Amino acid sequence: MTTRAALGLALLLAACGGGAKELLETAQFEELQRNTTHAQQLYRTIVAKHPGTPQAATAAERLRALDAAG
């Protein structure tokens, strides 16, 4: 999957109220592609829209790690 396709998927999921699992998978893919800005946006969306889920806990952990890495 290309970065453009992943971005399109992420936008589609966000527009459709994508589930936490799908958003997390997309954020992790973006992070692997070194698109950390977009990954952080997706992680923040997960934390805000899906609080209390395991995916939100993972997203919060990744945000802390990315913030610490600068």
Predicted segments with their positions:
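Alpha-helical linker/edge segments of TPR/alpha-solenoid repeat scaffolds
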Residues: 64-70
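Conserved small-residue packing positions in alpha-helical repeats and bundles
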Residues: 27, 61-64
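Bacterial signal peptide processing site
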Residues: 16-20
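Short solvent-exposed coil/turn linkers within tandem alpha-helical repeat scaffolds
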Residues: 47-58
